[in-house]
Amino acid sequence: MKTLLLTLVVVTIVCLDLGYTRKCNKLVPLFYKTCPAGKNLCYKMFMVSNLTVPVKRGCIDVCPKSSLLVKYVCCNTDRCN
């Protein structure tokens, strides 16, 4: 009976698929946030004039194209930005 109960609990957890969400760094990389559903990429935004210091980090659904003034770097693993 205990085995059956344990099996049911495991199957329930697997079927519910508690969901995996991406974790992305905030502007200060010591801190991160859990991304909302659908935002599966992390990004860093730089000013082209200074590519060493990011001005924004976070979660995003689609990586924006870089422009003459702003460069975006996107990745798809936890805290990769």
Curated annotation (Swiss-Prot):
One of its GO terms (molecular function) is toxin activity. SUPFAM superfamilies: Snake toxin-like (SSF57302). GO terms for biological process: killing of cells of another organism. Residues 1-21 form the signal peptide. Its main location: secreted. Expressed by the venom gland. One of its GO terms (cellular component) is other organism cell membrane. The keyword Signal applies. Pfam families: Toxin_cobra-type (PF21947). Keywords: Cardiotoxin, Cytolysis, Disulfide bond, Membrane, Secreted, Signal, Target cell membrane, Target membrane, Toxin. Disulfide bonds join C24-C42, C35-C59, C63-C74, C75-C80. The keyword Nuclease does not apply. PROSITE patterns: SNAKE_TOXIN. It is found in: Secreted; Target cell membrane. Monomer in solution; Homodimer and oligomer in the presence of negatively charged lipids forming a pore with a size ranging between 20 and 30 Angstroms. Belongs to the three-finger toxin family. Short-chain subfamily. Type IA cytotoxin sub-subfamily. Shows cytolytic activity on many different cells by forming pore in lipid membranes. In vivo, increases heart rate or kills the animal by cardiac arrest. In addition, it binds to heparin with high affinity, interacts with Kv channel-interacting protein 1 (KCNIP1) in a calcium-independent manner, and binds to integrin alpha-V/beta-3 (ITGAV/ITGB3) with moderate affinity. This is Cytotoxin 4N.
